Design a protein with these regions (language model features):
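Sec-dependent N-terminal signal peptides of Gram-positive bacterial secreted proteins and lipoproteins
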Residues: 1-8
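Acidic, metal/ion-coordinating pockets
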Residues: 12-184, 188
Length: 192
């Protein structure tokens, strides 16, 4: 799985009056969209977010990965239904988990395009260009605060997904990487 880290920026970045910010998150949903116990459906998540908003609260809804694969709901259409549900639920941000790559690299990129919310990952790198495939960070200005989310896609994706999806098969070489060597000094790992 992957994670998104929310952290308030320094107090110098606060703007005007500050209020509490509620961060709702999902992780490792694995397409269990009709889970009855506890009743955690996308409709229930959307209702929870809306109830905070109706009460005048600042709220963000984020997902830390592994949402498009796991049951027949995902495999029937390679996760398209899940992205539609997440769009309807009002997600603000997501980061790809290792299972977002289970339907292939082209599908992983298509999922991101289908989403009405941005994806972030600081360590999904295109080795042909040396650049990140996605933005590393997303800033939100809510509740008088500047809040940053940094996406990290688990480096174990190569062993938990299909390594061939990260390769140029015609040249038998990797063209994508999920290690953190591209973003930090070797003595300062960002992922533990």
């Amino acid at each position: 799985a992957s994670m998104a880290i929310g952290a308030p920026a320094a107090s110098a970045c606060w703007y005007g009056d500050k209020s509490d910010v509620t961060i709702l998150y999902t992780n490792d949903v694995h397409t269990y969209i009709d889970k009855q116990s506890p009743k955690l459906t996308y409709a229930a998540i959307a209702d929870l977010k809306q109830s905070y908003q109706n009460a005048g609260k600042d709220v963000l809804l984020v997902d830390a990965g592994d949402h498009i694969q796991g049951t027949a709901y995902g495999s029937m259409d390679d996760g398209a239904t899940i992205i539609e549900l997440m769009n309807e639920a009002g997600y603000d941000l997501a980061t790809p988990g290792n299972h977002e790559f289970d339907y292939g690299m082209a599908r992983a990129k298509a999922v991101i395009q289908e989403a009405d919310f941005p994806y972030v990952s600081c360590n999904w790198v295109d080795l042909r260009t040396g650049f990140n495939v996605l933005p590393s960070v997303k800033f939100f200005f809510v509740g008088g605060r500047k809040i940053a989310f940094v996406g990290v896609t688990t480096p174990e994706t190569f062993t938990k997904s299909t390594p061939a999806y990260f390769m140029d098969k015609s040249q038998s070489r990797y063209i994508y990487d999920l290690s953190l060597i591209h973003i930090s000094e070797p003595t300062r790992p960002l992922y533990i």
